[in-house]
Curated annotation (Swiss-Prot):
Region annotation Homomultimerization: where it falls in the sequence: 13-21
GO biological process, one term: mRNA transport
Organism of origin: Simian immunodeficiency virus agm.grivet (isolate AGM gr-1)
UniProt comment concerning the protein's domains: The RNA-binding motif binds to the RRE, a stem-and-loop structure present in incompletely spliced viral pre-mRNAs. This region also contains the NLS which mediates nuclear localization. These overlapping functions prevent Rev bound to RRE from undesirable return to the nucleus. When Rev binds the RRE, the NLS becomes masked while the NES remains accessible.
Subunit structure, as described in the record: Homomultimer; when bound to the RRE. Multimeric assembly is essential for activity.
Underlying gene: rev
Name this protein carries in UniProt: Protein Rev
Domain of life: Viruses
GO CC annotation terms, alphabetical: host cell cytoplasm; host cell nucleolus
Keyword check for RNA-binding: yes
């Protein structure tokens, strides 16, 4: 894998950062050595953060370049024209038809305004049949219940 010019520059910066903070070779009292190590550790954490920012900046620039490349490659693509969604039937009041629970399963009473019997699909809770919220469903159930 060959490195590009920007990658080499980023690695050179990171190498310089880490080379600028060698581990302390200090003689002295235990307290002086401990403080020197603590200072080194804090500086090393700062260098780690800076190196992370350098790499993230490089990766972000690389990502932006890749996105621009993709945009150029795909600029000629056109979305297909999709068909219109199915039309929702509305009655004269402007209220759309909905699916709602109707009669319990096993009941052969008419549960739709067309007068057909219903075979429940939800077990004992009932089935789903298209009805209108305007109240015509209740009227059709009453008329279907009368023999």
């Amino acid at each position: 894998m060959s490195l590009g010019k920007e990658e080499k520059q980023a690695l050179k910066i990171i190498k310089t950062l880490y080379g600028s903070n060698p581990y302390p070779q200090f003689s002295g009292t235990a307290r002086q050595r401990r403080r020197a190590r603590q200072r080194w550790r804090k500086q090393q954490q700062q260098i780690d953060k800076i190196a992370g920012r350098v790499l993230n900046t490089f990766e972000d620039q690389q990502l932006v370049a890749q996105l621009q490349e993709l945009q150029l490659e795909n600029k000629d693509l056109v979305l297909q024209h999709l068909p219109d969604p199915p039309h929702i039937h509305q009655d004269s009041s402007g209220i759309p038809a909905v699916w709602a629970p109707a009669t319990p399963r096993g009941s052969n009473r008419a549960c739709s305004s067309s007068g057909e019997g219903c075979e429940g699909s939800l077990g004992q809770t009932g089935c789903y049949c298209p009805i209108r919220l305007s109240g015509s469903h209740q009227q059709s159930k009453k008329s279907a219940a009368r023999p």
